[in-house]
Curated annotation (Swiss-Prot):
CDD domains: catalase_peroxidase_2 (cd08200). The gene is katG2. It comes from Burkholderia vietnamiensis (strain G4 / LMG 22486). Heme b binds at H269. Residues 1-28 form the signal peptide. Homodimer or homotetramer. One of its GO terms (biological process) is cellular response to hydrogen peroxide. The active site is at H108 (proton acceptor). Belongs to the peroxidase family. Peroxidase/catalase subfamily. Formation of the three residue Trp-Tyr-Met cross-link is important for the catalase, but not the peroxidase activity of the enzyme. This is Catalase-peroxidase 2. The keyword Lipid metabolism does not apply. GO terms for cellular component: cytosol.
Length: 741
């Protein structure tokens, strides 16, 4: 499965890319304009067409997991270690070691992850593509990836760029004396830029906060083009107190608590140096996206001095945090807490800090005859002046082993957060311990049910008296919590019965509780007293109940079809479920169930596409699922919006037939906001009510084209079979075990 993400709009994404290349209106003669240019309200379906298999040069049958298993990872590590200390004239290594440079590369590749929508992160290696490859915060990382190209070239398809960059960061840390927590492979590469909403700012370094100072969801970085926060302070203002607030919010939205945040900053700034030999405005050229073809994808050409080595310009800040920047030491914390720091400026004019009693004790990165004072960023000083961070920093300084473990675990979390559950990890270096942020699942201590058991359980479920629509709603609620951006959620674990999911309004908690109570009774009756070692999980029963109800609805439509079912799910415990971490998965809108909370900044139709994108659905799959779920009466709150059938509970194509019926005229309801009334054109009699999500399948030209297929007289069976296929896909989205068989 390819990671699927969504843009706020295609134009927003294009605008970001254009920041490096010039105005979006500057275009070659004859270049086409997107429909959104002329009609901004046009529903953008491009997120459902991202990362299709046709874009992958390895082809649809390529299995990265199998390719990775053939990799001699120790040989790769050896090659990385050699590269670390083999300085290249075209981009010399600071202190003769590229380790700190590669740590920054890995950190910035993974550090785009954000919890609210699961987008960003190391997976896909999006740092290679616009806009990330041209963000100000990623300046000169184009050279880091070029330094790694010989290794990528050598091992080819057996290691992705995403895995190689993270592994290189690990090896860099280890080569400089730090013990990492482990490494898991499995990051498949993307082959095109993501359409991700990174902020509304019209230019890089724009403030991502609104006029009230609130950081917009789902963003995490405080300024456009930064991974986290501005190292000089908010908007370049060297205020450590305000910087601490920015750090806490930005890192928190990237899944890090205070201890993890401090460990990451202190650990990362133990190594390397910042580069600000001269003014970027006077010396540095355009980012890679704006450079000419002769630059071959490289940017930030520096015309001052040699343009590299001692003359390197990256952030504009200049100097190192310790006197030994290529070995792991406790010097960062010792220096931060042991000195009084005063504000100064770098040679490039950037705000930074130096000891009040500054002495030239730091070796130059390229000239051993020179020494420099220590330096700190405003964001470093923030860790000293903020009471909570300062307390942690002092504890870490006094207990180095505690700091080492905290940094190791935080680094592992940073670089693996978007990889999903541990079942997706590859390789021999995967830590054996389960971590709560991995959404751990228990190991089944029983045999999985077989075909005869499945048939028996279906009969028991259908004979239980549970409403079929409630079985379908519960199964959908459980499985559709999945999001393909960071592979979280889904039916496996049956977390729909646990906090916080058991209280989500979109799921109709009271109705779900009744279904679960009945299913638990069936589970107990099946499992009790068995001598054959077989057991059924509630997670399997939830999905099986929905599938049995779908089969029943298909029979009512005249089609005897079996919904594919793969047993093997297990039941998680509350102790294995981090309530705060799972809370961000709660939908504020789900067009598949005609659910939409007030306060959303985006339209119901846009959020339907967003939800479909997270479920890794295509346009036809999204379309058939909406039509089928309406026919099955599966709306939240038993709403009749969009139930365009006189036979609810029958898996028919009537939603599409009646939506496209020209004898019905649609108008906004005069009494209910967000509701439309479909009336007989001749008599004015009310036939149906619908939401904007329902009507978009008739108003959007692209969706209407698909809806017409399913509304056709010859499409009854196709509709049923396509619905079952899409339903099964959603039920199995988190079954990573099935994809490895």
């Amino acid at each position: 499965m390819q990671r699927n993400r969504i843009a706020k709009s295609v134009l927003a994404a294009l605008a970001v890319i254009a920041m490096s290349a010039g105005s979006i209106s500057a275009r070659a003669d004859g270049a086409p304009r997107a429909n959104g240019f002329w009609w901004p309200e046009t529903l953008d379906l491009s997120p459902l067409r991202q990362h299709d298999v046709e874009s992958n040069p390895y082809g649809k049958d390529f299995d990265y997991a199998q390719a990775f298993q053939k990799l001699d990872i120790e040989a790769v590590k050896k090659d990385i270690r050699t590269t670390l200390t083999t300085s290249q004239d075209w981009w010399p290594a600071d202190y003769g070691n590229y380790g700190p440079f590669f740590i920054r590369m890995a950190w910035h590749g993974a550090g785009t992850y954000r919890t609210y929508d699961g987008r960003g992160g190391a997976g896909g290696a999006q740092q290679r593509f616009e806009p990330l490859n041209s963000w100000p915060d990623n300046a000169n990382l184009d050279k880091a990836r070029r330094l790694l190209w010989p290794i990528k070239k050598k091992y080819g398809q057996n290691i992705s760029w995403g895995d190689l960059m993270v592994l290189t960061g690990n090896v860099a840390l280890e080569s400089m004396g730090f013990q990492t927590f482990g490494f898991g492979g499995g990051r498949e590469d993307d082959w095109q830029s993501d359409l991700v909403y990174w902020g509304a700012g019209p230019k890089f370094m724009s403030n991502n906060r609104d006029k009230n100072g609130k950081l917009e969801k789902p963003l995490a970085a405080t300024q456009m083009g930064l991974i986290y926060v501005n190292p000089e302070g908010p908007n370049g203002n060297p205020d450590p107190v305000a910087a601490a607030q920015d750090i806490r919010e930005a890192f928190g939205r990237m899944a890090m608590n205070d201890e993890e945040t401090l460990a990451l900053i202190a650990g990362g700034h133990t190594f390397g140096k910042a580069h600000g030999a001269a003014s970027p405005d006077k010396c540095v050229g355009v980012a890679p996206a704006g450079a000419g073809v002769e630059a071959q994808g490289l940017g930030w050409a520096n015309k001052c001095g040699t343009g590299k080595g001692v003359d390197t310009i990256t952030s504009g800040l200049e100097g190192a945090w310790s006197v030994d920047p290529v070995h792991f030491t406790m010097q960062y914390l010792d220096n931060l807490l042991g000195h009084d720091w005063v504000l100064t400026k770098s040679p490039a004019g950037a705000h930074q800090w130096m000891p009040k009693d500054a002495q030239s004790i730091v070796p130059d990165a390229h000239d051993p005859s020179k020494l420099h004072p220590l330096m700190m960023f405003t964001t470093d000083i923030a860790l000293k002046v903020d009471p909570a961070y300062s307390k942690i920093a002092k504890r870490f300084e006094e207990h180095p082993d505690e700091f080492k473990l905290a940094f190791a675990k935080a680094w592992f979390k940073l670089t693996h957060r978007d990889l999903g559950p541990k079942a997706r990890y590859l390789g021999k270096d995967v830590p054996k311990v389960d971590l709560i942020w991995q959404d751990p699942l228990p190991v089944a201590g029983y045999q999985t049910i077989g075909a005869a058991d499945i048939a028996d359980l279906k009969s028991r479920i259908l004979a239980s008296g549970l409403p079929k629509s409630e079985l379908i709603k519960t199964a959908w609620a459980s499985a559709a919590s999945f999001r393909g951006t960071d592979y979280r959620g889904g039916a496996n674990g049956a977390r729909i019965r646990l906090a916080p999911e058991n209280g989500w309004a979109v799921n109709d908690p009271a109705s779900v509780a009744k279904v679960l109570k009945s299913l638990e009774a069936i589970q107990s009756g099946f499992n009790k007293g068995r001598t054959d070692g077989k057991q059924v999980s509630l997670a399997d029963l939830i999905v099986l109940g929905g599938s049995a109800a779908v089969e029943d609805a298909a029979r009512k439509a005249g089609y005897d079809i079996t919904v594919p079912f793969a047993p093997g799910r297990v039941d998680a415990t509350q102790a294995q479920t981090d309530v705060a971490s799972f809370a961000v998965l709660e939908p504020t809108a789900d067009g598949f169930r005609n659910y939409y909370q007030k306060g959303n900044e985006r339209s119901p139709a846009e959020l339907l596409v967003d939800r479909a994108s997270k479920l890794d659905l295509t346009v036809p799959e999204m379309t058939v699922l909406v039509g089928g779920l309406r026919a099955l009466d599966a709306n939240t709150g038993h709403s009749k919006l969009g139930v365009l059938t006189n036979h609810p509970g029958t898996l028919s194509n009537e939603f599409f037939v009646n939506l496209l019926d020209m004898s019905t005229e649609w108008k906004k309801s005069p009494s209910a906001d967000g509701t439309y009334e479909g009336r007989d054109r001749k008599t004015g009699a009310l036939r149906w009510t619908a939401s904007p999500v329902d009507l978009v399948f008739g108003s959007s030209s692209e969706l209407r084209a698909v809806a017409e297929v399913y509304a056709s007289d010859d499409a009854h069976e196709k509709f049923v079979r396509d619905f079952v296929a899409a339903w099964t896909k959603v039920m199995n989205l988190d079954r990573f075990d099935l994809k490895r068989i």
